[in-house]
């Protein structure tokens, strides 16, 4: 009985109402994503060990390198043989090729990214492996990077790095060719 009452009410509402037009929008996005970024590589956090601010008053004015890996997995068979390049993007510090930090040391500290060779500076906007990328040879691929904190030349000169939190954000983009 409840079902038929509901049906009657619906019918009454439809027959008593005026005709009304409404749009339905459909949207999508198709990707050629030969490999998936592993879950542990999405929204990655690289945490630098706590250091005294005075460590950034004298040359070389930098922290030890923290390593991190971007993992690609479930690479489709059509990806094998393709070259993948990874490019980090973010707000740059005045110190060329470094990421700008926020916090009390903005303009005094910067983040340097190291390329997959572990020693070459990877500038924001540049592709990894000196622009050459990596060949996808199987179902997965690991891209090892490093990062360190460095005092800007002005902060070294004036010994102006102070205690406090800092952070920087970079996004990465994968391109297949």
UniProtKB/Swiss-Prot annotation:
Q: Which Pfam families match?
A: Fimbrial
Q: Where does the signal sequence lie? A: 1-21
Q: Give me any GO biological process, just one.
A: cell adhesion involved in single-species biofilm formation
Q: Which SUPFAM superfamilies match?
A: Bacterial adhesins
Q: Which UniProt keywords apply?
A: Fimbrium, Signal
Compartments annotated for it: namely: Fimbrium
Stretches of the chain forming a coiled coil according to its record? none
Per the record, GO CC terms? pilus
PANTHER family cross-referenced by the UniProt entry: FIMBRIAL SUBUNIT, FIMBRIAL SUBUNIT ELFA-RELATED
What protein am I looking at? Answer: Protein PrsK
Q: Which gene encodes it?
A: prsK
């Amino acid at each position: 009985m409840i079902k038929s009452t509901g049906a009657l009410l619906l019918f009454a509402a439809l027959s008593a109402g005026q005709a009304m037009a409404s749009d339905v929008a459909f949207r999508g996005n198709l990707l050629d994503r030969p490999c998936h970024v592993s879950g542990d590589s999405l929204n990655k956090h690289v945490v630098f060990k706590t250091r005294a601010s005075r460590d950034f008053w004298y040359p070389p004015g930098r922290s030890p390198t923290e390593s991190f890996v971007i993992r690609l997995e479930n690479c489709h068979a059509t990806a094998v043989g393709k070259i993948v390049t990874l490019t980090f993007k973010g707000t740059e510090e005045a110190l060329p090729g470094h990421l700008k930090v926020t916090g009390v040391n903005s303009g005094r500290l910067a983040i340097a990214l190291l390329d997959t060779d572990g020693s070459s500076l990877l500038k924001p906007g540049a592709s990894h492996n000196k622009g050459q990328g990596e060949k996808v040879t199987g179902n997965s691929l690991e891209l090892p990077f490093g990062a360190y904190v460095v005092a800007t030349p002005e902060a070294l000169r004036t010994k102006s790095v102070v205690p406090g939190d800092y952070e920087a954000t970079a996004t990465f983009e994968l391109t297949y060719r």
